[in-house]
């Protein structure tokens, strides 16, 4: 709808010329557009109202190229910071970032726009660097003229590191010991200690169980399948196997799904198109669904790419075994995916890569070797981005599983470096976590300064994150010294260890635990809402656990003073002692005639567990 062009435009002239010639079809040998390049690759616009002309060139299948700037369609992701005119001119607005997508023919590309404040006297502080991560973060902050916040204090760091790395809270004694330690290496030492805890494995097995959709599904996938799959995954992380080898085992799995649980990847999902979509979203961070019915409007992928990549999954065979819960996965050696348009067979082709030789081979093994290797530029970056998002609260590409040209990384150089180091380091998962946690970027305070208070994408300060459902239930149980019981697990097992995505409680559901119905990262809900607040205030989880665990009663029976109990509650829950003001106000309630100290301190315990400081990692 609406007016596309007027009678005096070049587009009008071309259309009239074509119609006058009888509206001929293009000859069969007409060169096709195979690539699109935009210049500049990044534009920095200082102050509002500054303009920058873009140039777009198309490359054709016959080796020629031409300027297509005026024929290209431009779309800005943030027109408040950078507008793009129809003829390819950028105009800056308020400080911020934008990505301008450029689309010509069936190809999409784009450029990053940084609209920075007019501050010629800006000086970046002389900040030390913890490692290469800080180098890349600082380089970006210098460009956008943002000053990073300072480092968090030791109390904040130990709580943050415990929650992020192992999903637990530090014991009160551990907090006091850590704070009292004057060694300059104590934070790095703590990170190493936590990486060697069994809870680290449990955290990442849970996250990968979500990606791999480990859940029962009536008769198609029963609890024995789920627990064998889950335990196989746990064994891989316990051995710290290179993550690329784990993925290659999953994609190339064959044999019985009981004897080789990795094969359950092909028992949970049997539709070959859906398998391809899941594999690209999990292992490459890409959502290919759009390209099934039409060329992706916001990315480079075409329908040809979609069906060619899906053809790697076209020859998977499945048959029953003596146990009807198990399937035998094998290579049928025949069968192809056909393009929905024209019903033609698309030879298996790597995304953005070549057409490999698959004759006489298991196509999945060919795919596995490429996908989880250095030859695939998307794999290592995707894993690095996924881990980064866990520790930083958002990905360098966000959402983490929506990588596309029109959703670029906020810091491409940082993401590239993380991916390269992961690959060169043998896909050592722990080393990646170690690098992130030892950076000053991870260790910053959540307190903002004047320059970064509006920034949310450049990691100039730490983010405040609500603790995810399983971890929140676990730490409530931890500090109240109570236990939970989940299906198939012993009494006292943590919520992080739940095998089946179908197993849940009202608490876990309310706080956004993933059901594992899809591979989408959006299944884990971290946004706070009214239902959560009401359940904490009025539900039986916090209320019953405070009393059931008997923390306060036992402490008073051990002859601890109310003042000591208050300190211990704060240290156990918040990893800090109360401030002098907090302590004075709380002690005023102790010794009341009409209430026992036990009741007063239990009320305090309940209040702490309902506080934002407890529920959020900061």
Describe each model-derived feature in a short phrase:
Residues 50-54, 94-98, 323-325, 331-334, ...:
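A short, compositionally biased
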Residues 480-489, 494-497, 501, 507-513, ...:
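Long, His/Glu/Asp-enriched segments that create or flank divalent metal/ion-associated functional microenvironments
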Residues 4-25, 530-538, 542-548:
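Catalytic cores of secreted or luminal carbohydrate-active enzymes
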Residues 51, 69, 304, 362, ...:
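Extracytoplasmic
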Residues 9-139, 143:
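Extracytoplasmic soluble-region selector
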Residues 125-199, 204-487, 522-523, 543-601, ...:
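Primarily short, surface-exposed interaction patches in extracytoplasmic proteins
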Residues 2, 85-89, 293:
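Short beta-alpha junctions and helix-cap segments that line functional grooves
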